């Protein structure tokens, strides 16, 4: 398979092509040297690109995505040699920063302070903000750097210490299950259920470029979605087509959509 042609087919722009090229190089390094190789942290959209690349290469085993805990949003791609069956869990390190004033930091505050120290985005995984602490997933070299260098976020003073994966304070997901029937599994129909919109408003959101399916832009309201697809609507959040059920006597389809609050 010609590498250039495949990258051109999978990537929508230069940034995506560059990312896929780097990931492909990591995969080839693993196969050629038979050693574990890990990428930086990837956004959900970037993870979907990696899945498409691995699918195109027909690679179904020997790699996985991991971000430090089961429901992590940002994850690394781990490519495993033939002698390894699990990823190097230590490639994802964690630390906790505590502060005195409750609810005085946001995700943006924390990320901004890390970027201000010169930490790259791909070196940082999920940022889990609690009332008087924040847990941050990073690469091990960055954890060592932050333990020595990170003592504040804006005007908020921090006390930073390393923690293990079992100590992570993962916020409980707040979701709402929405059940309805649709005439078909068109994107605009499912979107209207997930975000309580009229069909016309849902279609307008799609055509105006506000909607992503599995973190890829999609502007065709009649696109068919399938169970498990993640739908994101700019400004309103995301939902998942959780279940596709049987048809009613009139031919409509029962669906369950999980809306993240």
Regions found by a protein language model. Name each.
Residues 1-188, 194, 217, 224, ...:
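Ferredoxin-like alpha/beta domains used as RNA- or RNAP-binding modules
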Residues 184-235:
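Basic (Lys/Arg-enriched) interaction patch that binds polyanionic ligands
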